[in-house]
Every structure is written in C-alpha cells, then in structure tokens.
Curated annotation (Swiss-Prot):
Post-translational modifications reported in the UniProt record: Phosphorylated.
UniProt record similarity statement: Belongs to the begomovirus movement protein BC1 family.
Predominant localisation class: host cell
Protein name in UniProt: Movement protein BC1
A Gene Ontology molecular function term of the record: DNA binding
The keyword Transport belongs to this UniProt entry's keyword annotation: yes
Signal peptide: none
Purpose: Transports viral genome to neighboring plant cells directly through plasmosdesmata, without any budding. The movement protein allows efficient cell to cell propagation, by bypassing the host cell wall barrier. Begomovirus genome is shuttled out of nucleus by Nuclear shuttle protein (NSP) and the movement protein transports the DNA-NSP complex to cell plasmodesmata and facilitates further movement across the cell wall.
Biological process according to GO: transport of virus in host, cell to cell
Length: 298
C-alpha cells in the first residue's frame, strides 16, 4: 500500500488495474491507501481523514453472450457485521461501467483503514474461476483538524457500453437512522440525584387513584412499571403486593363508611330561637364545669 501521492491533495491514489476471477462468494477488490509514512505525517499534524471519492473502473473480459450480474459492495468495518454495508452496485457482467461513491464520514489515522471493496457474480453462465474482468480503483482522501457535517451525495454509475442503459443497472446507499433521545435515569443515593423523590401518579381511564398509589418508589429507580390493575382485582395479585399498593382496595369499601352524611340542602332549617337555645345550653354547661373545677382547687 505504499504510494508517493500525498494525502492532502486533489489527486487520486490509483491502484493497479488487476484481473479478477469469477466467484459466487464475496472477494476483495484492491483499494490503494496512503503509505505508513504519509499517514504518520498526517497523525503528527493532529488531523483526521475522510474518504472523499471512490471510483471503481470495471472492464469485462467475457464472451458476447455471457450472462450474469456483478455485485460490488462498499463496507465500513467499524460497524457490526450485519450493518457494515454502506453502498452496493449491480450491473450486467458484460457492461463496462465506472462506479462512483462519495463518503460521508471521517476516520482516525490511529485505526486501520476501515473501508473495504468486495465483488461477487451471481446467476452467470461463465464458469467459476475464469478471469472475467479487469478492475481498477481510484481513491481520493482529505484531511481535517476535526470532523464536520458532510452533505450526503448519492452514489452514481457511469455506463460505458452502448448496448446497456439505465434499466440494466442499480445502486443503493445506506440511510441515516432517526435520532432517538435517551433519557437519564440516575441511580438512587447518588450525589446528583436532586429530582423529585416519587413518581407522579397518572390515572388512566377505568382506574382510580387508590389502585395506582404506591410507596417507596424513587424517580431515579429503574424498574418495570406494573401493568394497570383491574378494578375487579382479577389480575393485580400477580403484579403487586399489599406493601406496594396499600390503598388499592380503598375503592372497594362499603358506601356507608365513606358517606359524610346529608348535605345542608337535605337537612331541616333551624330558627333563630333554636340557635339561641343551643348557645345558652352550651354556655351553662361550660359555667357548671368551671365552678366544679374551682371548688376542687379550694
């Protein structure tokens, strides 16, 4: 992988045009990267690198009536095995094409170069092991002090054979996942646990406050919330206990124990004379009680 082409330039790093044998299994395509000396120079400068542009030149060496599809895949080995594919191209085995891929991510000089180019042939009438094409890869790199957002540019295919058109080729590029916010859940007892001590109670339709109230639940504790409790208490025992939900049976008390009595509109009205009589009796009882306590002190 030695080359005299500097990393920070507008030139491409060319790999040798190499003949490749037909195979149904994924096999690597040679992609020339900067020499160890050149990468060390960029590392000393304290910069990171980015693959700006990859060009894969495919030139077939098959009979006129050869059939089959060539599949070229670009991978980033920094990801898990099932998510490494970044782009993929498919085209007929007899079609001469130039494949263009534009990167959208940076990588560190301290790590191994993460990019891989792979090819395979499917549904072909050409025998396995036969040399079927020459492939040459060109790579353009750039260096930066730090990474920045890169505008996505879709991969393209340039068809060079007159017998083939856009309907004969296809390409795909990986999509960017939707960002998801991860909420912070502190462990109980930490110094930075300054939030409310108890979770707010949310009463859903068909539930009561008594069935949802709990004790001893900290906001920062990670636990699986129990399923909503049935009003008839048919399934609550398998999720809760009396210690966790001490008020869950409150809604089952008889109505008489919760009855505050008749409202003022349901009681008989009292006259002024009745009120004066009640006050007079109360005052007399207080005076008699006071006189009795005074005689005892003497």
């Amino acid at each position: 992988m030695d080359t005299s082409v500097p990393v920070i330039s507008s030139d491409y790093i060319h790999s040798a045009r190499t003949e490749y044998k037909l195979t149904n299994d994924e096999s690597p395509i040679t992609l020339q990267f900067p020499s160890t000396l050149e990468r060390t120079r960029v590392r000393i400068m304290g910069k990171c690198m980015k693959v700006d542009h990859v060009v894969i030149e495919y030139r077939n060496q098959v009979p006129f009536n050869a059939q089959g599809s060539v599949i070229v895949t670009i991978r980033d080995t920094r990801l898990s095995d099932e998510q490494q594919d970044q782009a993929q191209f498919t085209f007929p085995i007899g079609c001469n094409v130039d494949l263009h891929y534009f990167s959208a991510s940076y990588f560190s000089i301290d790590d191994n170069v993460p990019w891989q180019l792979l090819y395979k042939v499917e549904d072909s009438n050409v025998k396995n092991g036969i040399t079927f094409a020459q492939i040459k890869a060109k790579l353009k790199l750039s260096a930066a002090k730090h990474s920045t957002d890169i505008k996505f540019k879709q991969p393209t295919i340039k068809i060079l054979s007159k017998d083939y058109g856009p309907d004969c080729v296809d390409f795909w590029s990986v999509g960017k996942p939707k960002p998801i916010r991860r909420l912070i859940q502190n462990e109980p007892g930490t110094d930075y646990d300054t939030g409310p001590k108890y979770r707010p109670i949310t009463v859903q339709p068909g539930e009561t406050w008594a069935t949802k109230s709990t004790i001893g639940r900290y906001t920062s504790m990670r636990y699986t919330r129990p399923n909503p409790i049935d009003i008839d208490d048919s399934s609550s025992k398998q999720y809760t206990s009396e210690a966790e939900f001490p008020l869950r049976g409150l809604h089952q008390l008889p109505e008489a124990s919760l009855d505050p009595g008749d409202s003022i509109s349901q009681t008989q009205s009292m006259s002024k004379k009745d009120i004066e009589s009640i006050i007079e009796q109360t005052v007399n009882k207080c005076l008699i009680a006071h006189r009795g306590s005074s005689h005892k002190d003497l």
